[in-house]
């Protein structure tokens, strides 16, 4: 959600903090700030808006520190303004933070009861206050830091300065990435290797729960228990630091694991976390629309189909979804009162761009759901809805897909509220459900070891079928697409109700049948399809949730139990198992996971 940089050394750091923050702009942000230890005191410079606004502040008020931290912020708790911009200070402590502290309200109330006052609306300031309280009790900086970490619930990456400690930089991570960079007579902290890439090619990827104390020429790393540990130093060519996989074997694996943070960043851009209301950017009056026309290709098309289910269900607004390469070569019946929504990770997909231009020529208002905000589509539409998931390197889309679906969910809520099909209470409930999705996705990713075992058998198959009902029928298409893209196994996805209309002829004891069935209104019908498949010797891989597993018919070869979720976000939660299955099947088969044959990341030709 945010970008972090920290430097401890012997030379002024302000210019390099800014340089690093510019490299982190791809992550998205609405404010920026830096801080440094000057003459034993910590000084801050902050600005709302782009980094150039922060540079203007620094031009008027230079920062001469040799130890400093920097941050680009996407608002989660608190409005996007200077008061809520990082770094945040409490007493002797100044810090920057990426993540969400789930128990901040409880901690803030406790601190307020101690007479502590707050200058911002953020959850981050609570962390600074807790560290300062511990320091006031006489704890050493590192001990005060650890005592605070033990009290936090949620996700964080932190970089911390302490007043009077000009040669100390503290860092920690849980749920959000953080790296250490080793330089000559200086050390660095960063959100990723890209952040420290201009200054060093020696990078340490902190593991979950690690915290670290840096001075200009040494590092001390501790695990979550407080034990001193060593982590491997990786030499990362600075020319290719953007393409760094960290400790993962493939970009696809990394990007699957990036999804909790990625979706959190996406969702934060489309809802107000303080009021639990939808806050979709752009000038679109959903109340006056008579129809939405979605055009897309590949995985983006499937995300659009999921969007159709949700928008029609919640907002009673008709939605058509078409494959752009088909749409553009027929004569669709279009109306000026409709909205065309193009969906494309790159914003350059040729067929989608052509379909978008066709609709615009018919007088339709236009929007794009896109990752690349400077792309052709983004420049040509009336409204841009960015997905904010950061660079996606693997050809088979994972985090961009779930980010697109996250945007579609937010759009569905906003449209429903605008059209009066839900009231304020239901809007708040739905937004809270959406805000829970990143945590549930992380839990689903935790099924990876079990899915690895399944992959060994699936890798032997010649064909695989995926079945689902409702939005899960779209996810069945996505599961099949992922598997065929990277493992080269023939796979097909079907609406489970179509089973008896043809696909059941393919069922035998050699063909794995993946059935996606969370415990929702479609579950009983999906369970019936499962029984039909098993009666014919089909090898069922049943992907359900903690409620569905209680009601599933016996006989499945394998049952994968994802966390239970509201139907609003079940496609997000169930995406992780199908992505991991495709990934590990491809690994077993020795396929080129990140660059599968014949495929390109951005399809810019017809």
From Swiss-Prot:
CDD domains: GFAT (cd00714), SIS_GlmS_GlmD_1 (cd05008), SIS_GlmS_GlmD_2 (cd05009)
Catalyzed reactions: D-fructose 6-phosphate + L-glutamine = D-glucosamine 6-phosphate + L-glutamate
Catalytic residues (positions): 2 (nucleophile), 601 (for fru-6p isomerization activity)
Any single Pfam family the record assigns to this protein: SIS
GO molecular function, one term: glutamine-fructose-6-phosphate transaminase (isomerizing) activity
InterPro entries xref list: GATase_2_dom, GFAT, GFAT_N, GlmS/AgaS_SIS, GlmS/FrlB_SIS, Ntn_hydrolases_N, SIS_dom, SIS_dom_sf
EC number, as in UniProt: 2.6.1.16
Domain Glutamine amidotransferase type-2: start-end pairs: 2-217
Compartment(s) where it occurs, according to its Swiss-Prot or TrEMBL record: Cytoplasm
Entry keyword set: Aminotransferase, Cytoplasm, Glutamine amidotransferase, Repeat, Transferase
Superkingdom of source: Bacteria
Enzymatic class: transferase
GO CC annotations on file: cytosol
NCBIfam families: glmS, PRK00331.1
Free-text function comment from the UniProt entry: Catalyzes the first step in hexosamine metabolism, converting fructose-6P into glucosamine-6P using glutamine as a nitrogen source.
Protein name, entry field: Glutamine--fructose-6-phosphate aminotransferase [isomerizing]
Protein species of origin: Caulobacter vibrioides (strain ATCC 19089 / CIP 103742 / CB 15)
